[in-house]
Regions:
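Short, charged/polar surface micro-motifs in flexible loops or helix N-caps
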Residues: 84, 94, 131-135, 147
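Non-heme Fe(II)-dependent double-stranded beta-helix
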Residues: 1-21, 27-119
Length: 162
């Protein structure tokens, strides 16, 4: 894991790690203060202390929001920030096109899956806005799975090894 400097791209070692394993972990892409401020923003929207046009129309999914960047400048700033865009471009070999955001108010347990099943030719970036522990929603990755075939829903319902 690596602490991030402002607007830094990936090192050659990080690029090689990504090519081999299909992921790279960067720490402190955003500061704890930036993350906590956004968490507070989201809590205030959810409990009605703060108003944002269109928020109610898109927040009826229980514990998460979808595509908030379309109507919330703060979410858009995170999505297109150079500290996120540069490492993505280094992994992809070209500038990334941001297409989707999701914010989870609490743990977001999901069964094993590949995001590319839902969004072909995509790369995902996960920003943990709070400290992650073994009990509050860690992200599990399978090194090298990017070189295997795409997992289908039928595969997930049975024992499956990449």
């Amino acid at each position: 894991m690596t602490n991030r400097s402002q607007n830094a791209g990936l090192t050659e070692d990080q690029k090689a790690f990504y090519q081999e394993n299909g992921y790279v972990i960067l720490t402190r892409v955003f500061s704890p203060t930036e993350c906590q401020d956004f968490v507070t923003h989201m809590e205030e929207l959810q409990n009605g202390r703060k108003q944002l046009e269109h928020f109610g129309q898109h927040s009826n999914y229980g514990s998460r929001t979808f595509n908030q960047h379309l109507y919330d400048p703060w979410a858009l700033d995170f999505l297109i920030h150079p500290r996120l865009a540069r490492p993505l471009a280094d992994c992809m070999g070209d500038e990334a096109e941001a297409i989707q955001t999701m914010h989870f108010y609490q743990g977001s347990e999901h069964p094993r899956h590949q995001d590319q099943y839902y969004l072909p030719d995509c790369m995902s970036a996960w920003i943990a806005m709070v400290d992650v522990t073994d009990t509050n929603g860690p992200l599990c990755l399978q090194p090298g799975s990017h070189r295997g075939r795409l997992i289908t829903k039928r595969d997930v319902s049975k024992e499956f090894s990449l």
